[in-house]
Amino acid sequence: MAPAGVSLRATILCLLAWAGLAAGDRVYIHPFHLVIHNESTCEQLAKANAGKPKDPTFIPAPIQAKTSPVDEKALQDQLVLVAAKLDTEDKLRAAMVGMLANFLGFRIYGMHSELWGVVHGATVLSPTAVFGTLASLYLGALDHTADRLQAILGVPWKDKNCTSRLDAHKVLSALQAVQGLLVAQGRADSQAQLLLSTVVGVFTAPGLHLKQPFVQGLALYTPVVLPRSLDFTELDVAAEKIDRFMQAVTGWKTGCSLMGASVDSTLAFNTYVHFQGKMKGFSLLAEPQEFWVDNSTSVSVPMLSGMGTFQHWSDIQDNFSVTQVPFTESACLLLIQPHYASDLDKVEGLTFQQNSLNWMKKLSPRTIHLTMPQLVLQGSYDLQDLLAQAELPAILHTELNLQKLSNDRIRVGEVLNSIFFELEADEREPTESTQQLNKPEVLEVTLNRPFLFAVYDQSATALHFLGRVANPLSTA
């Protein structure tokens, strides 16, 4: 009998094959039974709703109320426990949700460059955070709002029957599994190569009631959910209060502008993600090195250097190269560099699209000496703007039917994703002997001009981050 891991990998390959059957504007992936309600759960829901009392509600504490700091180590330990308890179906569901998040992430990323204006800077987007934020709102949505959110998430439905509806609890649990699978790998050899923390802030106008089942459901996605109330009538002051609160609680660099909000806004729904990846066997160079923003402009930036046997491929036809640097057995950093800096936009269009992972099959092992910038990036973006830019249904600018979130009048002011992304050296264990540097078969790869990157985890088929670095010192 084949090992369970082999069987799981084979099934994931089948899912990937189905994923290629996308048509038109909407992506169709099978089998959807992994993420929708089945007849049994529909019957349970019907019985529970019959004569069900009103959901208990509460008013969030004021934003100035004292709050304990987030314990990131405890968060990582919880994710490791989540991963350890996954059965085969849970892992398949995580892979399914990972692919759905990839498709949505590519769709949004492919339309956002002009909106962000990142030609001379650096930025990072998390497909899983985008998907998680919209799935969280779906948890609180009803009727037409729920229909449109389900369509954006990539799961079609045939009718209004319960068995065609996305199961938000399954999806949010799967998203936590996706995070757990990434983090747990770095613990296998007692080395925490990867850190991934997610915090949700639910900021409401004073007096607005939140439903307890909604907030409890968010804990399936992340155990740190922070409901707080504040006055939105002075938007600059409100944004400053939210930033100050989140930085005090997390210690991360965050960004909240409330640019899309108005004085009658009653809700800001914000997702904050911190990623830290350690480059095994890499070291920080003693002196900053030149990074060429364009043919005539350079900046001095901290650089990492390391050597190892990495997967690599150079596309002579489209003039770009890809280097895959492993974090763990199944998680890696993908580095994509145009041969000519002026081709960054073209290469971005070629590689960051729905079938882009196909070129990973062309990678082959090479002994490489790699030099690249140390990355500390912060990116904040309002999903309302990104959905509009991607020509997806612009449902977040209007009054929504979020009656599973609150019975009060809801007017969404902001749906923020804030990413704090760090890439640093881990000098505990060299990947290869540096004595090999002068051997002719060693390929020198130096990322000293604009490039793209992605963090990919094969175990959940999930692209956790997509990024563009035109200037490591300037972030969007």
Swiss-Prot record:
GO biological process: angiotensin-activated signaling pathway; blood vessel remodeling; cell-cell signaling; G protein-coupled receptor signaling pathway; G protein-coupled receptor signaling pathway coupled to cGMP nucleotide second messenger; kidney development; low-density lipoprotein particle remodeling; maintenance of blood vessel diameter homeostasis by renin-angiotensin
The keyword Secreted is assigned to this record: yes
PTM note: Beta-decarboxylation of Asp-25 in angiotensin-2, by mononuclear leukocytes produces alanine. The resulting peptide form, angiotensin-A, has the same affinity for the AT1 receptor as angiotensin-2, but a higher affinity for the AT2 receptor. In response to low blood pressure, the enzyme renin/REN cleaves angiotensinogen to produce angiotensin-1. Angiotensin-1 is a substrate of ACE (angiotensin converting enzyme) that removes a dipeptide to yield the physiologically active peptide angiotensin-2. Angiotensin-1 and angiotensin-2 can be further processed to generate angiotensin-3, angiotensin-4. Angiotensin 1-9 is cleaved from angiotensin-1 by ACE2 and can be further processed by ACE to produce angiotensin 1-7, angiotensin 1-5 and angiotensin 1-4.
SUPFAM superfamilies, A to Z: Serpins (SSF56574)
Annotated InterPro entries: Angiotensinogen, Angiotensinogen_serpin_dom, Serpin_CS, Serpin_dom, Serpin_fam, Serpin_sf, Serpin_sf_1, Serpin_sf_2
Family affiliation: Belongs to the serpin family.
Quaternary assembly: During pregnancy, exists as a disulfide-linked 2:2 heterotetramer with the proform of PRG2 and as a complex (probably a 2:2:2 heterohexamer) with pro-PRG2 and C3dg.
Protein name listed in UniProt: Angiotensinogen
